[in-house]
Amino acid sequence: MAAIKYRLIKKDSRTNARLGILETPHGIIETPVFMPVGTQATVKSMTPEELKEIGATIILSNTYHLYLRPGHKIIEKAGGLHKFMNWDRAILTDSGGFQVFSLNSLRKITEDGVEFRSHIDGSRHFFTPEKVIEIQNALGSDIMMSFDECAPYPADYDYVKKSMELTIKWAERGKRAHKNTEKQALFGIVQGGTYEDLRKECAQRLVDMDFPGYSIGGLSVGEPKNVMYDIVDLTTEYLPEDKPRYLMGVGSPDDLIEGVIRGVDMFDCVLPTRIARNGTVFTSKGKLIVRDAPYAEDFSPLDEECDCYTCRNYSRAYIRHLFKANEILAARLATIHNLYFLIKLMERIREAIRQDRLLEFKKQFFKKYGYKEEY
């Protein structure tokens, strides 16, 4: 028995957008889907009950951070990540590759794996593809990621080629080490920087290994948006239709719509929660910095068109006051709204695909939000 099952329900007639159902050991997910990020086994400031109320069906957690603190063995003793954090819906864990490679001066890469120093206390650690699988097996997530090297942008061709080869070797090793295939699905991660031939080669070689799903990694790391979209377009072309596709670390409203148009099913990003804590919210008419002075006497909701808990109950003036007073509730209310906005956006995208109106929906959304239709 496979851990997950993807069913393609409908394809958009004018784009590569797909409507699907992803069955996991912890529930059914309608795709395309946005996954809130709970790095430390918590989506910052939100309870699991609140996440359910806003419609989250799957969240993401982070292997690197949970390995360092509290430790995967402790989470395993607790009965796995779902029990530990009291979340009974699906969880996806990333491999920690992106975090380890972000450490730069604190890490050293070999073919065996990566030696790195903890950002918490400077202690030395060594991640191999097998170790990363062992950690994720202990966490018990529904969907796991292979260990990959995330090349920086820009990077020269030879470096990215070596990096891609390493990612493929590590994917093979990780797949061999994965013990719990009936309850946890392991995705391969397509790398290759912004080089089209490397992306194509990496995708084809990973597809030959027959993973239950595929991630597109190494994007949204500083490259221009049109380059990212071109690479996504090219990559999805080489991925099987009957498996889910996940674009890692992408979550602004325009990127979600553009990603779906190019055949992506799953997205995650810290953006909505991070900007919420800084007093910035998404609205149907674009971003709004609620802590700014003009909102001191604005008693309207964050977004007139939103029916989230925050917009039903609180005004811009009140939320601005909370931010100015450094009250914890400010971040909570803004986070609830931002996550609800993106989850609702995905719902509207799915409905647009159902009705074959995705391009019309994009046009209307972009115009109202203030995006230029460049792509």
From Swiss-Prot:
The keyword Protease does not apply. Transmembrane segments: none annotated. It holds the Pfam family TGT. One of its GO terms (molecular function) is tRNA-guanosine(34) queuine transglycosylase activity. Residues 249-255, 273-277 are annotated as: RNA binding. The active site is at 94 (proton acceptor), 268 (nucleophile). Keywords: Glycosyltransferase, Metal-binding, Queuosine biosynthesis, Transferase, tRNA processing, Zinc. SUPFAM superfamilies: tRNA-guanine transglycosylase. It comes from the Bacteria. GO terms for cellular component: cytosol. Its cofactor is Zn(2+). Substrate binds at residues 94-98, 148, 191, 218. It catalyses: 7-aminomethyl-7-carbaguanine + guanosine(34) in tRNA = 7-aminomethyl-7-carbaguanosine(34) in tRNA + guanine. Binds 1 zinc ion per subunit. Zn(2+) binds at residues 306, 308, 311, 337. Gene3D superfamilies: Queuine tRNA-ribosyltransferase-like. GO terms for biological process: queuosine biosynthetic process; tRNA wobble guanine modification; tRNA-guanine transglycosylation. It is an enzyme of class 2 (transferase). Belongs to the queuine tRNA-ribosyltransferase family. Catalyzes the base-exchange of a guanine (G) residue with the queuine precursor 7-aminomethyl-7-deazaguanine (PreQ1) at position 34 (anticodon wobble position) in tRNAs with GU(N) anticodons (tRNA-Asp, -Asn, -His and -Tyr). Catalysis occurs through a double-displacement mechanism. The nucleophile active site attacks the C1' of nucleotide 34 to detach the guanine base from the RNA, forming a covalent enzyme-RNA intermediate. The proton acceptor active site deprotonates the incoming PreQ1, allowing a nucleophilic attack on the C1' of the ribose to form the product. Homodimer. Within each dimer, one monomer is responsible for RNA recognition and catalysis, while the other monomer binds to the replacement base PreQ1. This is Queuine tRNA-ribosyltransferase. The gene is tgt.
